């Protein structure tokens, strides 16, 4: 098969780092180095170059899509003879644990909110829609946290549906990584944002991923543009273990931390436990439930060492 035939056979346009960076055009970088430091995750090296070469072109693309969507809404309103109701544009960000979804989400929130249109951009993680630990324990699902059956899908779909319906305000539960649980009465209020970024393991999942659940509407049905942050599994495992070790020196030392008993472990023992957690939970979830959703994404960002994006695939 020739390169042209291969290109025609795939639903994606492929860009290497240099080709993608060229699509920035003249979009200015509105974030300072200090602001970028605050946005990055505990385990990531994030440079101004990475933001300029990868995330500015992405924010430019999203701005085009969002503007196009607003024009489409205006056409529909004109056809129906209705007054304009503000319908948020929903961006979904999926990928493995430790791949850097949260950093990508925070960066896009910062960049999109600084476009000349001064749009309001809200960010919600699907972690808040995990069942509380009490429920997971009762159902024997604590070792399946992050798997499809560990989520309150009814409430997650209800939340996204209400946002997409233009509700004046919608509440979302909040998750704490410190206590490793949903925060009781810790709701976050969303008030008709222009853009909602929804970040989580499961935003691309559909009915095929929930055979145990009879409902027929899924988060992915409400997502306007989806991003899958990808990386080879050996890198993901390495990043997960390194993140675990950094938490062991930091967050785990807090007496309120769910993982406080890991704080004083020797490094060799901590690595052993992190590897076990990866193999039995996170790596398994990646193979069974997360990776199979990758090809449903509008855009796939593939990372190499140091969390640097080396290629981008954009759905035609």
UniProtKB/Swiss-Prot annotation:
InterPro entries in UniProt: P-loop_NTPase, PanK, PRK/URK
GO molecular function: ATP binding; pantothenate kinase activity
Localization, UniProt: Cytoplasm
UniProtKB keywords: ATP-binding, Coenzyme A biosynthesis, Cytoplasm, Kinase, Nucleotide-binding, Transferase
Keyword Membrane: no
UniProt pathway annotation: Cofactor biosynthesis; coenzyme A biosynthesis; CoA from (R)-pantothenate: step 1/5
Binding site for ATP: 95-102
Reactions catalysed, as given in the entry: (R)-pantothenate + ATP = (R)-4'-phosphopantothenate + ADP + H(+)
GO cellular component, one term: cytoplasm
Any Pfam family hit: PRK
Entry EC no(s): 2.7.1.33
Database matches in CDD domains: PanK
GO BP field: coenzyme A biosynthetic process
Family per similarity comment: Belongs to the prokaryotic pantothenate kinase family.
NCBIfam families: panK_bact
HAMAP family: Pantothen_kinase_1
Record-linked PANTHER family: URIDINE KINASE
Protein name stated in the entry: Pantothenate kinase
Native source organism of the sequence: Yersinia pestis
Gene: coaA
């Amino acid at each position: 098969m020739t390169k042209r035939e291969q290109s025609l056979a795939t639903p994606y346009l492929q860009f290497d780092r240099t080709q993608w960076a060229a699509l920035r055009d003249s979009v200015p970088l509105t974030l300072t180095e200090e602001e970028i430091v605050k946005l990055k995750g505990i385990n990531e090296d994030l440079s101004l170059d990475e933001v300029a070469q990868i995330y500015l072109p992405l924010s430019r693309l999203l701005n085009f899509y969002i503007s196009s969507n607003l024009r489409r809404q205006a056409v529909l309103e004109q056809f129906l003879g209705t007054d304009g109701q503000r319908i948020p544009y929903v961006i979904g960000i999926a990928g493995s644990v430790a791949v850097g979804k949260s950093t990508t989400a925070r960066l896009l929130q910062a960049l999109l909110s600084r476009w000349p249109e001064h749009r309001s951009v809200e960010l919600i993680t699907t972690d808040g829609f995990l069942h509380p630990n009490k429920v997971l324990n009762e159902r024997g699902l604590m070792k399946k946290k992050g798997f499809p059956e560990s989520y309150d899908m009814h409430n997650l779909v209800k939340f996204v549906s209400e946002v997409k319906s233009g509700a004046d305000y919608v509440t979302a539960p909040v998750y704490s990584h410190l206590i490793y649980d949903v925060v009781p009465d810790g709701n976050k209020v969303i008030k008709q944002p222009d853009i909602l970024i929804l970040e989580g393991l499961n935003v691309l999942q559909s009915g095929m991923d929930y055979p145990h659940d009879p409902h027929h509407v899924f988060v992915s049905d409400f997502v306007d543009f989806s991003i899958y942050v990808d990386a080879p599994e050996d890198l993901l495992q390495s990043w997960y273990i390194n993140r675990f070790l950094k938490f062991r020196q930091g967050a785990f030392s807090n007496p309120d931390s769910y993982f406080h008993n890991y704080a004083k472990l020797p490094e060799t023992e901590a690595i052993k436990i992190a590897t076990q957690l990866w193999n039995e939970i996170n790596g398994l979830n990646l193979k069974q439930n997360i990776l199979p959703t990758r090809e449903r994404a509008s855009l796939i960002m593939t990372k190499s060492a140091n969390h640097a994006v080396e290629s981008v695939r954009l759905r035609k």
